[in-house]
């Protein structure tokens, strides 16, 4: 395999970066183990260990020798695209790491730890007042973070860019304008015409964990997931994907004992994330350009498998025999029943319970509030009422308690302001990629029906996966499909699927 890193300065950078990579590798293992294996009381020592490793990594990244090498590389003109990618990713990491003074980092860490505890108590007792003062502190920290990072148009831009490189408030505004104008009337029509149900008896059917474990393993085997050689499937409270490297990617799912589509769609979703990591160019091993380029692009891969494939008629018909074989109650249901059950549409208070059509309105609500938090004089006390008003306007339902409204997500307690829009970016891009993949694979649906997933995986590898983090998200998309993100594709997909 041809060596892609030729430049001597880049080779020096990568030799030093290997230690930073190794610390990240260890942190991934500790993070995965915390969710999957660690006994509850191990949390104190684990958090100290993770904190110390973060400090070590930060020191190595900002070591004068390392920073000087990256600065030197920025001035080089004869670099290839891979080497330019290395410089871009590291320069960005150094810029962000340098932006925050040590005392600010410490303040954020302490505040979010205490805020998370306050949020847990507030949610359990359905008492917003217990979280309110902490949310005011989080808002204040977010404003300060934006000032440290710097921005051209508005403070929220700086926070968006942390999670999705190059994303601006105007981009998010544009995508939500399309969804409000075109998706909202579609949602009303879907609910009115009732082609898909608002509820289904399969939601209440109970299952034994081992039944669904067999189904999930069968699905992953059909997808060609390299279990045992390069991948693992485990169980955690909240499904997630973590990569220790290109040859070690791990996913988790959950088994709740009812509503079996949740475990299937969680597994399929995480497979999409894992595939992105597994299909990277192996020459990127131990370098900063290994790994998905952004949260939004990553989410587009998981949503592609979950929504475009996992909720399709062809996929449901493919898995129906194995469902029937493993779930005794399935003899009462047809493939059409399962398809309708997989595609229920109903407004729900809880974002994580939302269906494909209503989900993005949950994100729109959070985007509007976050933008106000960071840009204007808005206090935490104003948020519950604003939340409820917006929920009623968008989905026609009004939360009756804080836990199904303002207190439902942990993100703000963690200080993650600017994160939510990446979920919608992923959903919109998944539909856009679908219409582009259909141009190259016109019999896409037939391939899914026959479990011929290799051509689909190869297309995703060629267009998205193999590039790792070489290009920023917008540039990667332009190279992959020749256009910018366009919310119209998702509107079209919803229309064709649900009406």
UniProtKB/Swiss-Prot annotation:
Binding-site positions, Co(2+): 269, 273, 299
Source domain of life is Archaea
An example Gene Ontology molecular-function term: metallocarboxypeptidase activity
Temperature notes for this entry: Optimum temperature is 90-100 degrees Celsius.
Q: Does the keyword Electron transport apply?
A: no
Reaction it catalyzes = Release of a C-terminal amino acid with broad specificity, except for -Pro
Q: Which GO terms describe its biological process?
A: proteolysis
Q: Which Gene3D superfamilies match?
A: 1.10.1370.30
Motif (DXRXT) on chain = 248-252
List the EC numbers from the record: 3.4.17.19
Domain named Peptidase M32: residues: 6-499
Query: What does the note accompanying the cofactor annotation read?
Result: Binds 1 cobalt ion per subunit. Can also utilize Mn(2+) (in vitro). Is not active with zinc ions.
Pfam family, any one: Peptidase_M32
Report the residue ranges where the short sequence motif HEXXH is annotated in this entry. 269-273
Q: Where is this motif: HPF?
A: 238-240
Matching entries from PROSITE patterns are given as: PEPTIDASE_M32, ZINC_PROTEASE
Which SUPFAM superfamilies does this entry report, sorted A to Z?
Metalloproteases ('zincins'), catalytic domain
Identify which residues the record assigns to the active site: 270 (proton donor/acceptor)
The record ties this protein, via InterPro entries, to: Peptidase_M32_Taq (IPR001333)
Oligomeric form and interacting partners: Homodimer.
* Function summary: Broad specificity carboxypetidase that releases amino acids sequentially from the C-terminus, including neutral, aromatic, polar and basic residues, but not Pro, Gly, Asp and Glu.
Which protein, by its recorded name, is this? Answer: Thermostable carboxypeptidase 1
């Amino acid at each position: 395999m041809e060596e892609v890193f030729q430049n001597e300065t880049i080779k020096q950078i990568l030799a030093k970066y290997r230690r930073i990579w190794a610390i990240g590798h260890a942190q991934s293992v500790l993070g995965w183990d915390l969710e999957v294996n660690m006994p509850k009381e191990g949390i104190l020592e684990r958090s100290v260990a993770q904190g110390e490793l973060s400090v070590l990594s930060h020191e190595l990244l900002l070591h004068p020798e390392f920073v000087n090498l990256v600065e030197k590389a920025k001035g080089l003109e004869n670099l290839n695209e891979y080497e330019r990618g290395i410089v871009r990713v590291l320069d960005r990491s150094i810029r962000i790491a340098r932006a925050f003074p040590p005392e600010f980092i410490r303040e954020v860490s302490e505040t979010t730890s205490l805020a998370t505890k306050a949020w847990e108590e507030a949610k359990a007792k359905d008492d917003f007042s217990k979280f309110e003062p902490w949310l005011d502190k989080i808002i204040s920290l977010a404003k300060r973070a934006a000032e440290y990072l710097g921005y051209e148009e508005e403070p929220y831009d700086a926070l968006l860019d942390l999670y999705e490189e190059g994303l601006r408030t105007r981009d998010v505004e544009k995508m939500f304008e399309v969804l409000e104008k075109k998706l909202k009337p579609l949602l009303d029509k879907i609910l009115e015409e009732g082609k898909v149900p608002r509820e289904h008896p399969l939601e209440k059917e109970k299952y034994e964990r081992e039944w669904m474990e067999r189904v999930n393993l069968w699905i992953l085997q059909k997808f060609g997931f390299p279990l045992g050689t390069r991948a693992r499937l485990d169980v955690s409270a909240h499904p997630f994907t973590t990569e220790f490297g290109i040859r070690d990617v791990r996913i988790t799912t959950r088994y709740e004992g009812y509503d079996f589509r949740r475990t299937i769609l969680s597994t399929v979703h995480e497979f999409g994330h894992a595939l992105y990591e597994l299909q990277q160019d192996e020459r990127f091993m131990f370098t900063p350009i290994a790994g998905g380029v952004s949260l939004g692009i990553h989410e587009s891969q998981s949503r592609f498998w979950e929504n475009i494939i996992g909720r399709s008629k062809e996929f449901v018909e493919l898995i129906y025999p194995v469902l029937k074989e493993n779930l005794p109650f399935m003899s009462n249901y047809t493939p059409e029943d399962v398809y309708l059950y997989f595609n229920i549409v109903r407004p729900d208070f809880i974002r994580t319970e939302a269906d494909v059509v209503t989900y993005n309105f949950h994100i729109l609500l959070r985007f509007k509030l976050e933008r106000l938090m960071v840009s204007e004089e808005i206090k935490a006390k104003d948020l519950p009422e604003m939340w409820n008003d917006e929920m009623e306007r968008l989905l026609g339902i009004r939360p009756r308690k804080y836990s199904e409204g303002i207190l439902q997500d942990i993100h703000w307690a963690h200080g993650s302001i600017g994160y939510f829009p990446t979920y919608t970016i992923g959903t919109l891009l998944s539909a856009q990629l679908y219409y582009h993949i259909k141009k190259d694979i016109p019999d896409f649906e037939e391939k899914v029906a026959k479990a011929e997933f290799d051509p689909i995986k190869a297309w995703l590898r060629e267009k998205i996966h193999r590039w790792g983090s070489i290009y920023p998200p917008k540039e990667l998309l332009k190279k992959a499909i020749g256009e910018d993100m366009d919310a119209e594709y998702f509107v079209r997909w919803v229309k064709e699927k649900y009406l």
